[in-house]
């Protein structure tokens, strides 16, 4: 119904609300079926950008899901939705739990996406060192599973985190890697990365000039001292301009990065073996929020698609992960 042009927004909303009322009223229904139902309901609200209603539906689904993989999917959906809403404290808690649960059942691909969502939450909270660590975990998971999109998104996040930490050589390295990996993405993605790479290069060169100016050999006489001081001042000004340009670029990352958030939000398929043949697609990476902002490292969904996956991130990392994808059947925002 959501993908059909035969129905308007009011028709879809009416159908969702009627379905919800029926489920709320009929508690005789098998609890194992209600979990997937409320999760799907949340996915419907998410696609309509009714994010508070999506959170409410996902919270109803969580205690009704019996399998760790299903619980992990709902936790990940909650984390992604809270990221879109700007509730980063709540988002990072849900993503941590989801990453641990995905790891406990060998869902390495899904775990990588949870780490990316967690890293974004941490970066928005200003904890760039922790964000760096989570992006590294996301990159490793993406490499383990051959997830090229996950790899360049993690590299882009690592570049931004490195810049915030003052590690401009690392920022250059990861932006270059991200650009090399995203050749099949839309031109807007490549243009964004080129702009970030250029800003990182300007900042790096300016910082190098400052470092060199500090070690210039001193010469006698006031004239030499004056020239050295002027040179140092010019270099410092150049570095500050480059740094300011980079921060402006990363401020718009709240636009560009928040756009990617709707780039991590993939919709997954279904819950339960009886629904495994359901077709799946996902929205193009990026997209505006109701306020006009864009979300980086989320992918706004167009249809539904699956994932499955229990404890915390550190415990999960110590496990041996399966390289084959295990599907839970629950619709998830990736």
UniProtKB/Swiss-Prot annotation:
Which stretches are TPR repeats?
35-68, 72-105, 112-145, 152-185
Region Disordered, annotated ranges: 220-258
Which keywords has UniProt assigned to this entry? Repeat, TPR repeat
Q: Which InterPro entries match?
A: TPR-like_helical_dom_sf, TPR_2, TPR_24, TPR_rpt
Q: Per the record, where are the segments of Polar residues compositional bias?
A: 233-246
Which Pfam families does the entry link to?
A: TPR_2 (PF07719)
Question: Which SUPFAM superfamilies would you find in this protein's record?
Answer: TPR-like (SSF48452)
Q: Which PANTHER family match?
A: TETRATRICOPEPTIDE REPEAT PROTEIN 24
Q: What is this protein called?
A: Tetratricopeptide repeat protein 24
Organism whose genome encodes this protein: Mus musculus
Ranked from the top, the taxonomy reads:
Eukaryota, Metazoa, Chordata, Craniata, Vertebrata
């Amino acid at each position: 119904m959501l993908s059909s042009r035969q129905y308007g927004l009011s028709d879809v909303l009416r159908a969702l609300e009627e379905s919800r009322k029926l489920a709320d009223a009929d508690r005789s229904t098998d609890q194992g079926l209600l979990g997937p139902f409320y999760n799907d309901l949340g996915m419907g609200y998410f696609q309509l950008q009714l994010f508070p209603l999506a959170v409410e539906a996902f919270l109803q689904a969580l205690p009704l899901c019996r399998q760790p993989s299903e619980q992990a999917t709902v936790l990940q959906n909650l984390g992604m939705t809270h990221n879109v809403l700007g509730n980063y404290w709540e988002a990072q808690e849900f993503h941590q739990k989801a990453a641990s649960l995905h790891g406990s059942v060998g869902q390495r691909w899904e775990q990588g996406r949870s780490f990316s969502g967690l890293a974004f939450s941490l970066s928005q909270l200003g904890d760039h060192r922790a964000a760096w660590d989570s992006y590294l975990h996301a990159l490793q998971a993406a490499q383990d599973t051959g997830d090229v999109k996950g790899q360049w998104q993690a590299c882009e996040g690592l570049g931004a985190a490195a810049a915030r930490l003052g590690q401009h050589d690392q920022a250059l390295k990861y932006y270059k890697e991200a650009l090399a990996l995203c050749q099949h993405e839309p031109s807007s993605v490549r243009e964004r990365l080129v702009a970030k790479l250029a800003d990182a290069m300007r900042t790096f060169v300016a910082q190098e000039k400052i470092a060199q100016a500090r070690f210039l050999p001193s010469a006698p006489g006031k004239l030499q001292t004056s020239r050295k001081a002027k040179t140092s001042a010019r270099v410092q000004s150049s570095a500050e301009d480059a740094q300011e340009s980079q921060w402006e670029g990363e401020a718009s990352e709240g636009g560009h990065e928040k756009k990617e958030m709707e780039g991590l939000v993939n919709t997954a398929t279904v819950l339960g073996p009886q629904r495994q043949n359901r077709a799946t697609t996902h929205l193009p990476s990026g997209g505006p929020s109701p306020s006009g902002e864009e979300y980086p490292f989320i992918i706004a969904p167009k249809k539904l698609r699956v994932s499955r996956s229990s404890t915390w991130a550190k415990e999960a990392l110590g496990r041996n992960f399966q390289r084959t994808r295990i599907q839970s059947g629950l619709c998830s925002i990736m």
